[in-house]
Design a protein with these regions (language model features):
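N-terminal subdomain of nucleotide-sugar transferases
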Residues: 1-64, 106-108
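A short helix->loop->beta-strand "cap" motif at the edges of active sites that frequently abuts
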Residues: 35, 130-134, 181-182
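Short, well-ordered alpha-helical microsegments
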Residues: 47-50, 120-124
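Acceptor-binding helix/loop patch of EC 2.4 sugar-transfer enzymes
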Residues: 75-87, 136-172
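Short N-terminal targeting/anchoring amphipathic segment
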Residues: 101-121, 134-136
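A short beta-strand/loop micro-motif in the catalytic core of glycosyltransferases
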Residues: 113-114, 174-187
Length: 187
């Protein structure tokens, strides 16, 4: 089997539970005899930078990272609010990264493409035409519920309203992903 994995942050070094879950999946894939190659693609942010030396050395593994700015801006948040799109997800989508992924899928035959979290799955719809692989969405959290809970516990009415909008847009995105993907794994 040949597998492409896209994550929204590097699994190594292991900084939190999400990193631990992604690292464990990668290690499990590499340990399977049926898996010939794992192409691991990861976004690298200021909060979660890429450290090549932290990844395991394995002849089955190739790693590609993409630096991306995901910092929150008032203008970006406002525009997303007006367009009724998820600002949480929009910050992780980048045209140059999409083109690199499309090129890799076009030039290589993968059996599976695994999207680690909703933030990586923002690329799924744009990548489908480039591969016959089965697409799998691996949910680490029910993201909209986290934001809904934040809204419930917020006193400031404007902030509460904005967090509710974020929760709603994430809920729509999660339902959309679940209805389109060919497989889903939740933790």
């Amino acid at each position: 089997l040949k597998i492409l994995v896209l994550s929204h942050k590097p699994p190594y070094p292991i900084l939190d539970g999400g990193c631990l879950a992604m690292a464990r999946l990668l290690e499990d894939l590499l340990s399977l005899k049926q898996v010939a190659q794992v192409h691991y693609h990861t976004l690298a942010t200021a909060k979660h930078p890429f450290e090549a030396e932290a990844f395991p050395v394995n002849e089955k593994l190739s790693v590609q990272h993409y630096p991306i700015r995901t910092n929150v801006t008032l203008v970006g948040a406002g525009i997303s609010l007006l367009k009724q799109e998820s600002y949480n997800l929009k910050r992780f989508k980048n045209q140059a990264i999409l083109q690199q992924l499309q090129k890799e899928l076009k030039n290589d035959d993968f059996d599976f493409v695994i999207f680690e979290s909703l933030f990586a799955a923002v690329y799924a719809r744009s990548l489908r035409p480039y591969s016959k692989a089965k697409f799998i969405y691996r949910a680490h959290n029910i993201e909209h519920q986290i934001w809904k809970d934040l809204a419930v516990n917020t006193k400031f009415i404007l902030k509460k309203w904005y967090l509710q909008q974020l929760a709603y847009s994430l809920k729509w995105a999660e339902r959309s992903i679940w209805s389109e993907d060919q497989g889903g794994l939740d933790l």
